[in-house]
Amino acid sequence: MTPTKQHKKETFTHFIFRVFMILVGAASAAVSIELFLIPNDFIDGGIIGVSLILDHLFMSNPFLNFAFFVVILNIPFMIFGYKYIGKTFLVSTFIGIVGLAVIESSLHHVEAITTQPILATVFGGLLLGFGVGLVIRNGGSMDGTEILGILLTKKLPFSVGEFVMFINVFIFIWAVFVFGPEQAMYSFMTYYIAMKTIDAVIQGLDETKAVIIVSEQYDEISDAILHRLGRGTTKLKGKGGYTDEEKDVIYAVVTRLEVTKLKSIVFEVDQNAFITIMNTHETRGGKFKNAIH
């Protein structure tokens, strides 16, 4: 029986750096929400959007505020994320969401930066997108609807993007009745700007990424991806154009929430590995295994 290989775990220094970057992202999102969105009755999509609407509806109760709702509503999704994506994702997401709630609450008595709708839309969207993107780039998430989308679309004939958009349509329709059509339209513009900013921060919003890895340690890397990320790999035969040497090439498909973890795994095994990460237009067929890192 072949003994199970022991793989390196994330170093404490790298973990602290990730936590710092996640908190920077949470702070950016909190500033956007408290100083741009809430004063102008704007919302975002997903759990943040629902939390903003509920914050407005229960404004007479100081305890039922945005911070309360964004934590409570995300708890079920964090549990699902732990089960299907992994412990690292759970810890990163927990830090991001709690950080967002705490920082947003501490800004309650700070005056709004602007009440000009266009300025609030543009800069609120930019700050929110930057913050959420930074959290995702460092292995976490602030939006449970995307986690739910990743899980449900394994069994439903929809992409994650289609599922999230479907949910957000209902959230913005709800906003029309709560805030009025004009604020809902500004909110949609804010959401669009935020999504484009997230795209720029994490280099791609597709739910899955195709990854090609070239390394002399292809067996160990493939084994690490399987046992730490729970993803299968395909070994391809390649030949160097200059050296004419044959090489084994690893091909894998992962969700965008797993890209950070995959890169960490690869470079822990081989710092000289060559990685290419590509957006996939659509992924159909086959079965993703549950992540077990």
Curated annotation (Swiss-Prot):
TM region(s), chain numbering: 19-39, 40-60, 62-82, 84-104, 116-136, 160-180
Coiled-coil region(s): none
Disulfide partners: none
Membrane topology: Multi-pass membrane protein
Keywords noted in UniProt: Cell membrane, Membrane, Transmembrane, Transmembrane helix
GO cellular component: plasma membrane
Protein name: UPF0750 membrane protein YqfU
Species whose genome carries this gene: Bacillus subtilis (strain 168)
Gene behind this protein: yqfU
